[in-house]
Amino acid sequence: MTVYHFVGIKGTGMSPLAQILHDNGYNVQGSDIEKYIFTQTALEERNIPIYPFDPENIKPGMTVIAGNAFPDTHPEIEKAQAEGLPVVRYHKFLGDYLKKFTSIAVTGAHGKTSTTGLLSHVIKKAKPTSYLIGDGTGKGCENSEYFVLEACEYRRHFLSYQPDYAIMTNIDFDHPDYFANIDDVFDAFQTMALQVNKGIIACGDDEYLMKIHANVPVVYYGFAEENDFQARNVIKNTEGTTFDVFVRNTFYDTFYIPAYGSHNVLNALAVIALCHYEQVDVDIIKEGLQTFGGVKRRFNEKHAGSQVLIDDYAHHPTEITVTIEAARQKYPERDIVAVFQPHTFTRTQSFLNEFAESLKKADYVYLCDIFGSARENAGKLTIGDLQEKIPQAKLIDENDTSILKEHENAVLIFMGAGDIQKYLRAYENVLA
């Protein structure tokens, strides 16, 4: 049996794919940088070998799966090609692998990871399901009927897939280092829609998704009355959210989610619509929604003394807004303190004003230095340019986070897609 060697095994897609192959009995190993990345924990729990990058890792008989961050000139990839071994890019391999299952791709500018996690949790209670979530979680299940995956629009990677179903949560301008504008983003989603084989579940409250054309049925969900699946009578409190679902204006059932913010109602609606389409029993859906514990780096909470510390991946103005909204729903009596690390110079430059407006929704704002991507050079932009647009915003350094102790009884939200967790860990050490 071939050994699958992953070049960049700690990637947020690569790690779960390695987990899935391992769970299905394949021989798996990989290489990556030696710095700790949270995605390696699940690999280590399965005793999947992780090696430092070295051409000597490449042995005869291997199949090499290459992460997208690594060019063909990477020493391991060059060695594999020189020895005539199969070298397959992550998305191409996954696109072929999906064809064995009823595949459900979850895509959209925001909400992909949470919706993928929620759908996986619910639908696996109905039928055996394998899943790949962009928080580094993967699970291969023997005799799987469904395969649920997070599919990202960045660099049009999701066009490697021809899924049976697609959930489309929203279309928004992001990844300005690749997409020219919102029309370019829409074009990518429109192309994706034409590759879906059975049906599309799309948010009908999104003006761009309403324009999608497809060769399969498009089922719309949302708060507006025109949607096929509509949430009504939404009740938000500190324990979570309850809402009624109407299917084409006929009452279906009442659902409860232990989650906060309107965006989580929409994520749940997408899952309800897909499961209804696949004739999953409503009691299974209700139980799954109630017992979902969330995904990594999405509103992950811990209590420290009088404070609540939240770790969240929010790195776009829209995401910051809904994360602060969720915190206000759960903790209406507390101050909200945003500790934000912008991710990439291009994104920060493109959305400078929007970042400022979204962060102003917090009571206090602390800004970390911009986290640059490996793909870009630092421009002239500095974190001071964002600070100028937010009255009373302060800069914070990883080596001195003690100022945060001043905010007694507050909710501190550490947000970003870079290494914002370093700041959270540093602050926890101050408190220890």
UniProtKB/Swiss-Prot annotation:
> Sorted alphabetically, which keywords does the UniProt record give?
ATP-binding, Cell cycle, Cell division, Cell shape, Cell wall biogenesis/degradation, Cytoplasm, Ligase, Nucleotide-binding, Peptidoglycan synthesis
Q: Where in the cell is it found?
A: Cytoplasm
Look at the named UniProt entry and state the broad enzyme category this protein falls under: ligase
* GO biological process terms, semicolon-separated: cell division; cell wall organization; peptidoglycan biosynthetic process; regulation of cell shape
Superkingdom field: Bacteria
Catalysed reactions, as listed in the record? UDP-N-acetyl-alpha-D-muramate + L-alanine + ATP = UDP-N-acetyl-alpha-D-muramoyl-L-alanine + ADP + phosphate + H(+)
Q: What is its main location?
A: cytoplasm
Residue positions annotated to bind ATP are G108, A109, H110, G111, K112, T113, S114
E.C. designation(s): 6.3.2.8
Q: Which InterPro entries match?
A: Mur-like_cat_sf, Mur_ligase_C, Mur_ligase_C_dom_sf, Mur_ligase_cen, Mur_ligase_N, MurCDEF_pg_biosynth, UDP-N-AcMur_Ala_ligase_MurC
Q: Which GO terms describe its cellular component?
A: cytoplasm
Q: Which Pfam families match?
A: Mur_ligase, Mur_ligase_C, Mur_ligase_M
Q: In which pathway does it act?
A: Cell wall biogenesis; peptidoglycan biosynthesis
Q: What are the GO MF terms of this UniProt record?
A: ATP binding; UDP-N-acetylmuramate-L-alanine ligase activity
The similarity annotation says:
Belongs to the MurCDEF family.
Task: Please give the function described in this protein's UniProt entry.
Answer: Cell wall formation.
What protein am I looking at?
UDP-N-acetylmuramate--L-alanine ligase
What is the source species?
Bacillus licheniformis (strain ATCC 14580 / DSM 13 / JCM 2505 / CCUG 7422 / NBRC 12200 / NCIMB 9375 / NCTC 10341 / NRRL NRS-1264 / Gibson 46)
